[in-house]
Amino acid sequence: MAEGEITTFTALTEKFNLPPGNYKKPKLLYCSNGGHFLRILPDGTVDGTRDRSDQHIQLQLSAESVGEVYIKSTETGQYLAMDTDGLLYGSQTPNEECLFLERLEENHYNTYISKKHAEKNWFVGLKKNGSCKRGPRTHYGQKAILFLPLPVSSD
């Protein structure tokens, strides 16, 4: 190839006909603030725990589109959601409150912003004591909003 030439590739048009589903393994979302794992309980409560053996911390992240994810508890089947007051809760069915914008930060942690409230910059966050931080109380630069996706098994 000569200097200055541009190579273009044709778009992939073939379909792969894969069955629906998510092929990613469940993850644990470890919060930098206080060392808690994000947890969705059967009653819809969302909080953090340091107990790595808790079954409610296993989360399935599935992409809706580029950078947009649903976060679902593998144990309860509930989706992480943020209501109009910025409170986190578990929803039985996926809806617009369950979509989050996932972003990999420079420090290799992930942040999750509620897509519905993206213009307000409401992040998923945990306080040092493990309780949820309301969306309006979160902002960029806080440790409370930094999550590290970890494998479920420690090996």
From Swiss-Prot:
Pfam families: FGF (PF00167). Residues 127-143 are annotated as: Heparin-binding. Changing K127E: Reduced integrin-binding. Defective in integrin-, heparin- and FGFR1-binding, and defective in inducing FGF1 signaling, cell proliferation and cell migration. The modification N-acetylalanine is found at A2. Changing K133A: Loss of LRRC59-binding. PROSITE patterns: HBGF_FGF. One of its GO terms (cellular component) is extracellular space. Changing N33A: No effect on integrin-binding. Its main location: secreted. GO terms for biological process: activation of protein kinase B activity; anatomical structure morphogenesis; angiogenesis; branch elongation involved in ureteric bud branching; cellular response to heat; epithelial cell proliferation; fibroblast growth factor receptor signaling pathway; lung development. Residues 2-15 form a propeptide. Changing S114A: Decrease in LRRC59-binding. Plays an important role in the regulation of cell survival, cell division, angiogenesis, cell differentiation and cell migration. Functions as a potent mitogen in vitro. Acts as a ligand for FGFR1 and integrins. Binds to FGFR1 in the presence of heparin leading to FGFR1 dimerization and activation via sequential autophosphorylation on tyrosine residues which act as docking sites for interacting proteins, leading to the activation of several signaling cascades. Binds to integrin ITGAV:ITGB3. This is Fibroblast growth factor 1. It comes from Homo sapiens (Human). The lineage of its organism: Eukaryota, Metazoa, Chordata, Craniata, Vertebrata.
